[in-house]
Amino acid sequence: ILTEGAKHVLGWKSPHYVYHCAYNPNLKILLRDFKLSDDISLRFSNSDWSEYPLFADKYIGWIAGLPEEEQVINIFMELSALGIAQPLSSNILQFIKALPACAKEKGISFSTPFEIVTKFKSVDQVDVPYPMSWADEERDTSCWLGNVMQREAFNKLYSVAGRVHLCDD
């Protein structure tokens, strides 16, 4: 499972390890580093950001500066970050293109989720009992269920669940 590395779920734990589900130890969990992910997807072209401008060598330097025992840095973002949230004029594509060479210089490699869960053992369990989102600061569903109309629509939709399950087509 790929999910948000929200502070209210992790507590004191780091998102930079492989975890497993509290209810199913065979189900591995990879947690998004929201700060490093948002540095690209949200802040990259923000000239008011204290780290602006962001270059690939600087970004990889941040990752290389993390404690060596932290095994995995998960950077997840929506594809819309490349060209929409971060316009092409911001040089976002040149930044992304430069990342592999900068990472190689620092001995940092890229891996798929499958490669990560195959290579690394889980260090602990994580319990994620509620839906999460990376859409807002709360890292929950409040941005979609934050007002009366949204909650009413949600509740109406789920009120027919029993009837939907009775259908056989």
Show the residue positions of the predicted features.
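Conserved beta-strand positions
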Residues: 2-3, 77
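Active-site and substrate-binding clefts of carbohydrate-active enzymes
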Residues: 16-39, 45-50, 54-169
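Extended, H/D-rich, highly charged conserved domains that either
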Residues: 4-17
